[in-house]
Amino acid sequence: VMSWVAAGFAIAGFAIVHIVLSRGMMRVAAAILTVFAILAAAIGIDQSYGEYATIGSLFGEDSYSQADLTGLAKRKDLITVAQWRKQAANGTIRNIPANGTVNKIDIPATKSQFEARKALVYLPPAALADSKRKPALPVVLMLSGQPGSPGRVFQAGGIQTMMDGYAKTHDGLAPIVIAADQLGADSHNTLCVDSKVYGNALTYRRTWSTG
């Protein structure tokens, strides 16, 4: 990261000197070089952190589709992880997907009336397998920093790649990961409290599973 910063400042500084001292096309070329130096440094730094995976993510956009949760198993139909692994070892579970999925979900704010953005949920292969009885899986809840969003949690954190890697060596098993939104917007610093400025973020967090 520091090398990108140093290189960017060095090239931009060199170009700015030529903008001041040069004339005509040399000045134009130096101005263009300044822009490219700053842009290249910014891209290099972002590659190190993985904060913005796409151009759209700069503007809060993402490519995730709405989740279809109608086919998820009900609590009474769940089996233990040990039972699942035994069935997987016996070959009685078929069509376990190679990868999990990441989709948008709505977490109702019935009690808090907090204007949250859509959350993201990662479902591991075991939750998507062609099996009537799915395993009971742990749920990991993640929140972004500020500025931030559920999408940036998944992109910058490489959540799907990490979880899929774990699932590949554990019969499709991995935690369900939910990135909820406690901010409402990148520019809002709710401090996870109820306030007149940004709404009832604390109440939303306390009741996120029930609305």
Show which residues each predicted segment covers.
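Non-catalytic cap/lid and distal C-terminal segments of serine-dependent acyl enzymes
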Residues: V1-G211
